[in-house]
Amino acid sequence: ISECLVGSEMCIRDRWLTGVDVLITGDRITGLVPTGSVKAREIVDLTGKTILPAFIDSHVHIESSMLTPAHFSDLVVPEGTGTVVADPHEIANVLGTEGIRFMIENAEGCPLDIRFMLPSCVPATPFEHAGAVLEADDLAPFFNDPAVLGLAEVMNVPGVLAGDEKLLKKIALARSLGRPVDGHAPGIKGINLQRFAAAGITSDHECSTPEEVRARIACGMAVNLREGSSARTLRTLLKAVTPENAASCLFCNDDAHACDVKARGNMQKHLRIAVEEGLPAMEAVRMATINAARHYGLKEVGAVAPGWRADLAVVDNLTDFNVTDVFLKGRLAAQEGQIIWKAPVKTIPDTVLSRVNTGPLSEKTFALPLTGRQARVIRLVPNDLLTEEDIRPVVTSDGLFDAARNPGLVKLAVIERHHATGNRGLAILSGYIREDARMDGAVAVTVAHDSHNLIIAGGSDADMLTAAEALRCTGGGMVLVKKGHVEALLALPVAGLMTTETAEVFIEKQAAFYAKLRSLFDFAEGIDPVMTMAFTALPVIPAVRLTDMGLFDVTRFAFTTVEV
């Protein structure tokens, strides 16, 4: 026996144990024995603490942290996370199979066990232009990689219901191999939900209400209960959890900024919220560990038991789940919030760098003609990814929408950035700034789910152009412009989505960017100025979105007009 963890309480799936030591040899748990009954080369005293299985994030887009997989590992391991089920569809929408390959290779050798679901919808719909198109034949070779678990979130629900041949071929491929197929079905209910599940979809992470959680479980699906940087709905969704259905519930982040992970924790925030909402700690732990392991076929992790991999998170209490020690593959990986076992340094290939190709831009690119006095507006919903359609009175100047004359409204632009097509969509956004505020500047980012075109919110065409040109010259990232001057810029050179810097360095820069952003503009409550804006381009979440092809009505699955 090489290692013995002593003096602690522990969770073993269905009950708490005390007076038991955990024996570890190599990367395996070799026994649970009475305290002091076995000698080991190394004794780790965990008196007063509780040993839990290392946490599992059941659905996450690593790219949303804006870190590469290796640096993401260094961020979340000290938070007690041992395994993540990642969907690399962000970078796949920019770089196709090359992006998937980069993520898998960059994750190799990390202490964090990074498993992948293959992107099912690149692009998410035919109503936008991404950097690549992936079909079943493109995905098939990746299923031979042991890091790949299944097929990632199927977002094109209308395509499934209509029997889209290419989409169903991807689902059939995964099912033929016995792999799970994740879903993405916001607002879908009744017979359409049953048809979606019957197509082979095994989970959904897009629930917004307890009723939606219950409906999916009734259809035999697992539900990934989400608490991310923009979508913060876990407290609401937990109202659906009962002792009878808890085994079908998993925790996930989906999309979370690095600075948010550092501030609120990774999976600990889910555990903390669950206990605050009255869920027994044991049940919460299962939802953060074994439930996800069982659903995704991870047979070595999720429990503290003989023969299982020694992936353990040690906490000092079961209220806020403060993580003090993390053991992965039997090694001490982190302690007191500091990474000890760092991921190997990886060289970033030139082929994934500097991907902003918009073609020429001018102020006219951002001109939004309106002939009437009313407009169809995208209204943001605080702390959610859903949007609503709103008809608002607007003021124009020379026949063009003038954000400077419309308090509470900003102009939104999505510009195709992959193939210099010249495509651009324009819309009006409410709920981004306070109702009585004006935005005398612009915010732009090359993160715009899921096709990741260039997205810009602003109060003047000149500032929006300045922001766009800044990112075109930089090769991707986030930029803040006020009255013609670039006030802050954060480069994201990897596909325009991720930094090459460490988590520690990037979080400091990201925090400074956000501080500057919030000091210059009056954003509405419950809005992440970057992440919330980035999701306004995703045409698979109701109700109204903007792509590089125009304003899109998700409910009708058809384009609409700003003009009323």
Please name every model-derived segment.
Residues 293-410, 419, 539-544:
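Hard-cation-handling environments
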Residues 365-459, 463-466, 472:
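Non-catalytic interaction/regulatory modules that flank or connect domains
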Residues 1-12:
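Short, small-residue-biased leader/transition segments that mark boundaries at the very start
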Residues 73-180, 244, 487-490:
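Divalent-metal coordination cores built from histidine and acidic residues
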Residues 133-153, 159-225, 231-251, 262-283, ...:
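Histidine/acidic residue-rich metal-binding segments in metalloenzymes
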Residues 35-38, 43-109, 462:
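Metal-associated gating/positioning segment near the N- to mid-region
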Residues 410, 427-451, 457, 461-564:
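Catalytic centers of hydrolytic enzymes
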Residues 240-321, 327, 446-457, 468-472, ...:
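His/Asp/Glu-enriched, well-ordered alpha-helical/loop segment
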